């Protein structure tokens, strides 16, 4: 076990004093809990004993009451983080492999990042290494590490009009809440104000900001490790207009980027305002998903308010979703970017640049693992103007420029000390007076929750695909494409047999005979989706061909039509002549009637004269 855990024997720095004076090093093995409390008494830590099956509670304190500049401040921070000893070993083995092949940049030397990739590939080291190497190559080709300096998204306000989305607040467990109003998305107008390439770069930039700024800020605010988010999708009004060909192409590209490079970042998802049509979508799609993945996604109708309020406090939920927040002073909830990442004190801790040390201990029935994390730091250039509103507090940590460098702590490469009945690996610790993160890892609690034999079993390849909001768009697209194809097949009897043969693939008998392999389910899903997309592409090509053709009429029909037109013209001329003759006859008749009346009057007068 010592060979696999050599990395955890690195020294841990628990603090840096103002005069940088090094204190005497002592190993955790040699120092009792009482001595530790005495040694760090100046930090005013309050450690509470916990059982092996319970989580330890931690507190965040700030040393000193006077306000000094950030370079003179000392923060002490304890973050709750539960590790599994088997996961620690797997991450260490994976890390050693990456180091040996020069595939571990300092900015990615992070326990939780590597763990997410391992979970995405079900702890298969070979597949995880391939996924990791592809991610490293993508970051280099895409320029991800310098995207904050190289790219500015000036059209953000216009994009937000036609694609309402953004983070707003945190849930009751401290995770950031991401909201999208898919029914209000207008892909045509969206592509008028930006391009696909620029939108993809904006998407990556925001994901980097979330991973490097927002999630660490949530960790500090919640005093526990957080590396995933809660998502709310409002699908009211979603229809065929949302699934044009450019929109589908964009969704597929975003989904591939998220799944390949930012795995396991979704904690739970709520799909609200889903009507009967969308429920049909969900009933179809969830057949291809792992049951544990299905438990993460909650499809709710229009009575979603109570469910959301169980997870998210009303003050953190926008009013249009049943909460009380309006963010009137920030242009509305979708523009406010509300969250702990805008808190000046938290930003000071993120920007201070001091080493945050994590002291971890993992307990199980066989050994006690004590570990200390010495995280790396990366400069992140943030352009969030909302952090510039802080008065004297922000003046200590921010320049007057909107774009500034943030020193973001990476929260976890692990150095460990194993304590057991037979062997022990003492970890030296040096004390400095600096910002510090203290973590306690209770593996027995995790072992009680799930058997170690099933580690990683809940993270199947299917669950790795349902991580981002863009995948839901893919589900919606699959449903509407299938529905459209079904209608066409019903209208064309000659293709009925072909349609039935395809639909029988997903029938109950086929599902019963399908082997219970997650890989098979993934392949089946990909085959169904690719075949549907291909058929839809063929239909679109045919429609475009019909639109591009000129509507030409055969010569014979054109001659007949011209003859008929000429005949109609002749009939109209004859009708006009007939009307004229009839009018003249009527005039003549009126003249004759008037003449007869005059003659009768004259005869009457003559007879009257004769009588007199």
From Swiss-Prot:
Location of region: Disordered:
16-36, 379-400, 498-518
**Keywords, in A-Z order:** Cell membrane, Coiled coil, Golgi apparatus, Membrane, Protein transport, Transport
Extract the coiled-coil ranges from the record. Answer: 555-588
UniProt-listed GO biological process terms: protein transport
A single GO CC term, please? Golgi membrane
The cross-references to PROSITE patterns, in alphabetical order and at most eight, read: CRAL_TRIO
Would you tell me the protein name for this molecule? Phosphatidylinositol/phosphatidylcholine transfer protein SFH5
* Compartments in which it is found: Golgi apparatus membrane; Cell membrane
Taxonomic lineage of the native organism: Eukaryota, Viridiplantae, Streptophyta, Embryophyta, Tracheophyta
What SMART domains is this protein classified in?
CRAL_TRIO_N, SEC14
Q: Which family does it belong to?
A: Belongs to the SFH family.
């Amino acid at each position: 076990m010592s060979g696999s855990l050599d990395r955890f024997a690195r020294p841990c720095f628990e603090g840096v004093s103002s005069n940088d004076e090094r204190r005497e090093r002592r190993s955790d093995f040699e120092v009792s809990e009482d001595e530790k409390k005495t040694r760090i008494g100046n930090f005013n830590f309050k450690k509470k004993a916990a059982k092996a099956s319970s989580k330890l509670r931690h507190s965040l304190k700030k040393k000193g009451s006077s306000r000094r500049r950030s370079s003179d401040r000392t923060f002490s921070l304890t973050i709750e983080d539960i590790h599994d000893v088997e996961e620690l070993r797997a991450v260490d083995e994976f890390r050693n492999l990456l180091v040996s092949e020069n595939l571990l940049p300092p900015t990615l030397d992070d326990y939780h990042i590597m763990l997410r990739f391992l979970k995405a590939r079900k702890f298969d080291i070979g597949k995880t290494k391939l996924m990791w190497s592809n991610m490293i190559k993508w970051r280099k080709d895409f320029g991800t590490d310098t995207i904050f300096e190289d790219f500015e998204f000036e059209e953000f306000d216009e994009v937000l009009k036609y694609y309402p989305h953004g983070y707003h607040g945190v849930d009751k467990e401290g995770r950031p809440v991401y909201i999208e109003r898919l029914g209000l998305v207008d892909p045509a107008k969206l592509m008028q104000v930006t391009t696909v390439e620029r939108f993809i770069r904006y998407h990556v930039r925001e994901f980097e900001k979330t991973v490097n700024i927002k999630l660490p800020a949530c960790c500090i605010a919640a005093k526990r490790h957080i590396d995933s988010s809660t998502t709310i999708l409002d699908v009211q009004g979603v229809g065929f207009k949302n699934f044009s060909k450019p929109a589908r192409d964009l969704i597929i590209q975003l989904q591939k980027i998220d799944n390949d490079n930012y795995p396991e970042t979704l904690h739970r998802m709520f799909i609200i305002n889903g009507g009967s049509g969308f429920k049909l979508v969900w009933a179809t799609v969830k057949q291809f998903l792992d049951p544990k993945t299905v438990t993460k996604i909650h499809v709710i109708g229009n009575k979603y308010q109570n469910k959301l309020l169980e997870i998210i406090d009303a003050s953190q939920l926008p009013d249009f979703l049943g909460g009380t927040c309006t963010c009137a002073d920030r242009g509305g909830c979708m523009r406010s970017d509300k969250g702990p990442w805008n808190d000046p004190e938290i930003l000071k801790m993120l920007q201070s640049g001091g080493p945050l040390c994590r002291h971890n201990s993992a307990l199980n029935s066989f050994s006690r693992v004590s570990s200390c994390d010495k995280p790396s730091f990366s400069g992140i250039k943030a352009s969030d103007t909302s952090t510039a509103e802080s008065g004297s507090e922000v003046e200590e940590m921010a320049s007057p420029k909107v774009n500034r460098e943030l020193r973001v702590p990476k929260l976890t490469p692990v150095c460990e000390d194993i304590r057991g009945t037979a062997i022990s690996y003492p970890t030296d610790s040096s004390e400095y007076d600096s910002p510090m993160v203290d973590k306690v890892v209770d593996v027995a609690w995790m072992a009680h929750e799930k058997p170690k034999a099933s580690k990683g079993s809940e993270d199947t390849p299917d669950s790795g695909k349902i991580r981002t909001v863009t995948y839901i768009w893919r589900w919606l697209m699959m449903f509407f494409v299938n529905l459209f194809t079904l209608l066409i097949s019903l209208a064309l009897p000659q293709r009925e047999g072909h349609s039935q043969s395809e639909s029988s693939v997903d029938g109950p008998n086929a599902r019963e005979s399908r082997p219970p392999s997650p890989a098979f389910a993934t392949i089946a899903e990909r085959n169904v989706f690719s075949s549907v997309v291909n058929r839809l592409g063929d239909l679109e090509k045919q429609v475009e061909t019909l639109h591009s053709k000129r509507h030409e009429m055969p010569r014979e029909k054109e001659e007949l039509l011209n003859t008929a037109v000429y005949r109609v013209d002749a009939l109209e001329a004859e009708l006009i002549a007939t009307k004229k003759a009839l009018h003249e006859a009527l005039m003549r008749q009126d003249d004759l009637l008037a003449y007869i009346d005059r003659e009768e009057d004259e005869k009457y007068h003559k007879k009257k004269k004769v009588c007199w």
